[in-house]
């Protein structure tokens, strides 16, 4: 884990990466973001949190399925690495 809270939000539908989404996936992506918000509330991340979507090899993606990292419960740094 990269933070005390490190969650992954994945769609059931297989989408390889953010670069592979289509206009048909707009509702699905919105649902994923609403899920992030609800999880942030559930895990009491009221001081803030970071969301990350790594895309393809140079973007740091190592799992070939779209997912959002939700990181919280620590002060985030910039640049991330």
Regions from the PLM with identified roles:
Residues 1-81:
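HIT superfamily nucleotide-processing domains
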């Amino acid at each position: 884990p990269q933070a005390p809270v490190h969650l992954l939000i994945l769609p059931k539908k297989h989408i390889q990466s953010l670069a592979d989404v289509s206009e048909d996936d707009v509702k699905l992506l919105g649902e994923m973001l609403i899920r992030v918000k609800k999880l942030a509330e559930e895990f009491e991340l009221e001081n803030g949190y970071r969301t990350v979507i790594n895309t393809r090899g140079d973007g740091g993606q190592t799992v070939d399925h779209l997912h959002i990292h939700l990181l919280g419960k620590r002060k985030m740094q910039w640049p991330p690495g």
